[in-house]
Amino acid sequence: MPVGNSDRGIGLWAGQIMFGFDNSNEYIDWWHDVLPDSLENFEHKGAMASSILTPSVTIGLSNYINISLSQVIGYRHMFWDKDEYSIHHRTEGSNNNFINAVGGLLGDRKVMIRYLITNTGKGSGTRVFVGGGVSLPSKNTLTSDPFFLDNRDEIDEHRHFSVSDGCYKLVGELQFYLKRDYDPVFVGGAFQVQTPIDENKYGY
């Protein structure tokens, strides 16, 4: 099968069911200098570790139409590597609540419907799919703008990260793969775009 996300490049026939599981781990060692107009006159330094799991199920409604359901399950942890107190950063995890954050492990849910234009099984040929769907946010998000863009005078303790951004999004997708009888067997890729329908309920 094509490499990448577990539901990429695979079309199901009517009645078939496929379960998938994607995992992404990330570690960011970060630092930045003193911010302009900041009350904190020291460098900021730390690390951010993230582990994101995305189980999914795809069902062949017909030989040409598939539906996929997926759920993000994630955890992000900030390590604050300074002795000074900061209103911007501290050692904490995305599973816990904070002043401007609802903590938890569940992220966005996604529902996708794909039309299989071509779906080569045995032998060489193309797999071309077009799809569309919606991404549904969880409640585990930031409850205010962490950059205080609308009112700099109200800057207080806050968090910058969560497992969901709280926005409903429309999703469009195009997949194109060429299946061959020699290595590499699959050549191609997928293009996906997500766009928010509106601001989230917290206004950002």
Regions found by a protein language model. Name each.
Residues 8-10, 21-23, 55-61, 69, ...:
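Residues on the lipid-exposed face of transmembrane beta-strands in outer-membrane beta-barrel proteins
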Residues 38-43, 92-101, 156-162, 199-204:
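Extracellular loop and loop/strand-boundary signature of outer-membrane beta-barrel proteins
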Residues 25-52, 160:
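Surface-exposed strand-loop-strand hairpins of Gram-negative outer-membrane beta-barrel proteins
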Residues 31-38, 79-86, 141-149, 198-204:
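Outer-membrane beta-barrel translocator domains and adjoining extracellular loop/strand segments
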Residues 13-15, 49-53, 95, 102-109, ...:
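Residues that define the transmembrane beta-barrel architecture of outer-membrane proteins
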Residues 23-29, 71-77, 117, 134-140, ...:
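Transmembrane beta-strands of outer-membrane beta-barrel pores
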Residues 108-168:
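Hydrophobic alpha-helical segments and helix pairs
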Residues 7-16, 28, 64, 119-128, ...:
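Short loop/turn motifs that connect adjacent beta-strands in outer-membrane beta-barrel proteins
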